Every structure is written in structure tokens, then in C-alpha cells.
From Swiss-Prot:
The keyword Chloroplast applies. This is Large ribosomal subunit protein uL23c. It is found in: Plastid, Chloroplast. Keywords: Chloroplast, Plastid, Ribonucleoprotein, Ribosomal protein, RNA-binding, rRNA-binding. Its main location: plastid. HAMAP family: Ribosomal_uL23_B (MF_01369_B). It comes from Chlamydomonas reinhardtii (Chlamydomonas smithii). The lineage of its organism: Eukaryota, Viridiplantae, Chlorophyta, core chlorophytes, Chlorophyceae.
Length: 95
């Protein structure tokens, strides 16, 4: 289930939304739907999710030498949490 959530997005805009509206931004697998994203975050981080907003950014063309291609597709999910709850980014696996 952890492989469905790729990584958190930390920019100035998401940092402001984090403290202002309790909104966390993550890049998730492209195949997930909003109810699936909500269920993943509620079970993985043990929080109550109020809403899930998603969008798929446009593909970016990359070029290395003569070879051209595209960056991998992903879905960006904006998660709004219940009052007084937070997500700890530093989940560690003790393997």
C-alpha cells in the first residue's frame, strides 16, 4: 500500500496550505480514484480525511542527448484533514 503513495510535494504553496487549511499534497499512483486515495491515507497514516482533490499535471518532455522522451505520469492528490490531526512525513521502516 505504501507503493501507491509516491512522495509528498513540498513547495512554498503547499507549505502555506499545510498550516492554513490542513491540506497535504502528495503524488500518488495514476490509477487510484478519490475513494481509494482516502482509504489509503486513513489506513496508512491513521487520520480522518475530510476531502480529496486530485489533478493530473501535463506531461513534460525531456531530452538526454539525441534521445527524447517524457517524464512518468502521476496524479497529484491534495488531502484535507480533520481539525487537530497531522501526517508525520518521516515514517521509518525498521528492517
Amino acid at each position: 500500500m505504501l507503493d501507491l503513495v509516491k512522495y509528498p510535494v513540498i513547495t512554498q504553496k503547499t507549505y502555506i496550505a499545510l498550516f492554513k487549511d490542513r491540506q497535504y499534497t502528495f503524488d500518488v499512483d495514476l490509477r487510484l480514484t478519490k475513494p481509494q486515495i482516502k482509504k489509503v491515507f486513513e489506513t496508512l497514516f491513521n487520520v480522518d480525511v475530510i476531502s480529496v482533490n486530485t489533478h493530473i499535471p501535463p506531461r513534460q518532455k525531456i531530452r538526454v542527448g539525441l534521445a527524447q522522451g517524457y517524464r512518468p505520469r502521476y496524479k497529484r492528490a491534495i488531502i484535507t484533514l480533520k481539525e487537530g490531526q497531522s501526517i508525520n512525513y518521516s515514517l521509518k521502516n525498521d528492517n
